Amino acid sequence: LGKFYYKKATTGGFDRQYIKDQNQNLDDIGKDIREVDTKINDHKKAKNAHTSDQIAHSSGLTVAQEIEVEKARIRNLVLNVDGTNIKEVVDARVDRNGTIYPTLRDRLDADGKVVDDIRDDLITRISFKNALSYGADPTGKTPSADAIQSALDEIHSEGGGWLVIPGGTYLIEKRMIIYENTRVTMAADCVLLRGWAGGFFINGRPDDSFSGYSGRSNIIIEGGILDGNYANIDKYPTTAMDSIILGHANNIWIDCVTFKDTITAHAIDANGCNNLQITRSNFLGFIDLSGKRPFSEAIQLGEFVEMGVNQFGAFDGTPNQNVYIAHNHFGKSELLGGWGCGVGNHYSVYNIFQTGITLFDNDFEDCTFAGVRTFKWGEVKILNNRFKRNNECIRISQAAGGIESSKNVEGVQMNRPQNAQNVLIQGNDFYDYKSYGILSFGQIYNNEIAWSDGIRILGNYFKLKAKEVGEYDYEQAIKLVFARNAFISDNRIFGGRRGMWIEGCFNTFIDRNYVSCVDTEAIYVEKSRDKTSTVPKSYHISIDRNEINTTGRNGIFIQNCDHFDIRDNNVLNTNKEQSSTRGRGGIYVENGYDGRIENSRIRGVEKEFAILVKDAATEVNVTNTKGTGRVIVEGDSNFNGYYGTTQDDYIRKISTKSSS
């Protein structure tokens, strides 16, 4: 036990310090007593409270010495009692737990069974099959698919297992079937080289009739390189190949695989999978030999229908759900260019939705169509990815009516457009896109609208190479057509033809963005392209607290929009284009109904006006404008001022325009 220290009286009387020290001593004494009590109780319960050589015996020896003496006497008796070691054999019938077996053989059999059980358990846990043991050729001189399939078949017959393919180059002459409960591990320097017209793996047989997610599941494919062998296209001709085909499955994980030089189709064609993970893999090099598939996806996420995958299973439209795609790289190879699309789909099934899809921390480079294309996907998260040199980075598509994607699973044409909801695009970096950073289209068919609904574009970074204003081509950071309930907030946009394009949208909130150095407008509301009067204009747009610095034309351009609010925006240095035929400035309203422009700060020496509201607009008021330039409000119903009430409490206009 430790030493205990307490305070002594340091004052001459019963004063405040004395009482304080006394209370402190009482508190310390209580703690020390509890500590001693705890140590005593622990000592009583401890298995090693004392070792046997610490305890004295009545003989004068320690307990340890007494035990060793008795053990030596017993050994001597057992070994020498009759000179034949019979007693030693009898003694060996007793095991470590004190169990006495009828014969020594019974004890040996029992112990042997324990050893065998442990061995079998370890084999089950850690054993694997080596592809070389089945005849796979790591030199690539002879085909290896049959040998690898033999190993996979044996694993299947055993109810599951682990196949390892060591380093080397293996010529693959047919597609190999991976069954349920199988793990395939390829060494980092293992190359499966296409040696026929198709790809490498599939998780189904032609005679499988699985539906839903009941197919061959619990599969891991990891490591290695799946090489489409485009360098030898003449020796092994093909027009299209999928490297891996998956369907009707649950719990699939593809990790650390490199897909190289894929031809026309997909690296991974996943249809009707639940709990699909694709991580830390590389998708390098693609070519479209058909000339008809500029949209081909490295990872296709499709419903299980015949037009998507016709290899096995029921064509019941089973969607992918709960998909996690993370830490992957999509780009060029040494031989071929980038993909049409990194992750996406290009068809759908009426009333079936793919949901719960997350794309996190991926690199999409040099995609000629789009880095990511959602097609009627719901509950999507696109987070912390990097997009470089793509034509489009993210395209959000809905299904139109009157096309293949508006048929139900029975093939009946429903003739209706359809949408999914809730796409979150957050924390991504977009560099040097050729057309759009983010592009979304809803669909109108037979006067019915399928909105792109619930898009949230938050905290992203858009950056193009610096150019003089007027030198960009078609690059726009964000374009939304027929979107509803969209939130665009906290984004940073540098460069391009335009910052944001809003067209035929309902309930759009644009807040706290920074837009700099664009050729035309930072925020532009376009006329609706709809000719059916289904969505003739935009409704309910709020443009608040944005920072706009340096535009070729107007900072904010409003037209074809009812019920709009433009509040608390800073607009600087507009009209850099300096058109000789049309004046431009900070905020321009061509037409629209029921708008308000409040608390603007507008500065710059090249603008023609700070704010201009044309007479084609109605019921628009402008108030509390700070900065430089003219505030021009045309039209009888528009005014520079705010609203108050009359003596009898009716709303009325209060003009702030000076009479002088």
Predicted regions and their residues:
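Right-handed parallel beta-helix
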Residues: S214-G356, E365, V469-E471
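Acidic Gly/Asp/Thr-rich repetitive segments characteristic of extracellular carbohydrate-active
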Residues: A131-P166
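Parallel beta-helix/beta-solenoid
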Residues: Y179-T182, A187, R216, I221, ...
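N-terminal extracellular ligand-recognition/capping segment immediately after the signal peptide
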Residues: Q149, E158-G199, G204-P206, L226, ...
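Short glycine/acidic-rich loop motifs that flank beta-strands on beta-rich extracellular proteins
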Residues: G160, E173-R175, A188, R194-G198, ...
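Intrinsically disordered, low-complexity Ser/Thr- and acidic-rich flexible linkers and loops
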Residues: F210-Y213, G291-R293, V305-P319, S348, ...
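Extracellular "spike/adhesin" assembly and maturation modules
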Residues: L1-N48, S52-S58, E68, K87-V90, ...
